[in-house]
């Protein structure tokens, strides 16, 4: 910028993104069955999913969605080679992200048969992505939730507040990784009774930011 003094340099700090291998280790250590990736637009959800697949589920069937901005959203079943429109742009809808109107027939033609085959196989299933359009097809939503009981799921989940997406991420067997918050809040736990003297006495009365650890 023009108002920068001569000799000053602008330093841009990169956004921290754990490697796919690190996320995979955390997921496996959790003991959960499903790995759900969420985050804002452009946060790298699909890129991360593709990086995880070779180690996690290289041959899993995939149900993909792709948007043509201002026109439609298409769902594609990679195993069957089938595709259908599941959302169409509607200029009458309020401005914002959700200007696609759900097309239930598209879910019925491609989405539901794909989920049924995935459930029957009882292996890994890959879904990219699940979002607000699914709210227009109750059968598809229920099929995804039912599939969690018989399959292992690797999925990209759009970061929106809908009953379906909340139920999906709240599943007790789901490990949810949020790319907008890659590092959990840090805390400090002091394991001390206060009675031992190996590291000095009155440990719980030690000062931290002007206050004792234990009041």
Enumerate the predicted regions with their spans.
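N-terminal pre-Walker A segment at the start of P-loop NTPase domains
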Residues: 12-23
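Hydrophobic anchor at the beta1->P-loop junction of P-loop NTPases
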Residues: 37
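The conserved Walker
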Residues: 41
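Conserved lysine of the Walker
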Residues: 45
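Hydrophobic positions on the alpha1 helix immediately C-terminal to the Walker A/P-loop
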Residues: 48, 52
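N-terminal phosphate/diphosphate-binding loop that engages ATP/GTP or pyrophosphate donors
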Residues: 54-98
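N-terminal glycine-rich phosphate-binding loop and ensuing alpha1 helix
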Residues: 187-215
């Amino acid at each position: 910028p023009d108002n920068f003094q001569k000799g000053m340099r602008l330093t841009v700090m990169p956004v921290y993104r754990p490697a796919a291998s690190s996320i995979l280790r955390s997921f496996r250590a959790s003991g959960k069955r499903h790995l759900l990736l969420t985050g804002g637009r452009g946060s790298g959800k699909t890129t991360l999913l593709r990086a995880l697949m070779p180690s996690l589920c290289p041959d899993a069937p995939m149900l993909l969605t792709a948007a043509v901005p201002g026109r439609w959203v298409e769902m594609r079943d990679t195993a069957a080679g089938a595709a259908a429109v599941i959302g169409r742009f509607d200029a009458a809808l309020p401005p914002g992200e959700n200007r696609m109107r759900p097309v239930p027939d598209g879910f019925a033609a491609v989405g539901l048969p794909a989920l049924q085959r995935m459930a029957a196989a009882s292996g890994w299933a890959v879904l990219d992505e699940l979002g607000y359009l699914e709210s227009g097809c109750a059968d598809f939503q229920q099929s995804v939730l039912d599939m969690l009981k018989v399959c292992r799921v690797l999925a990209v989940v759009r970061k929106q507040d809908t009953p379906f997406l909340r139920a999906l991420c709240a599943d007790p067997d789901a490990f949810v990784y949020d790319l907008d918050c890659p590092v959990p809040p840090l805390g400090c736990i002091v394991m001390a009774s206060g009675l031992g003297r190996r590291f000095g006495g009155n440990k719980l009365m030690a000062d931290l930011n002007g206050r004792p650890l234990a009041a």
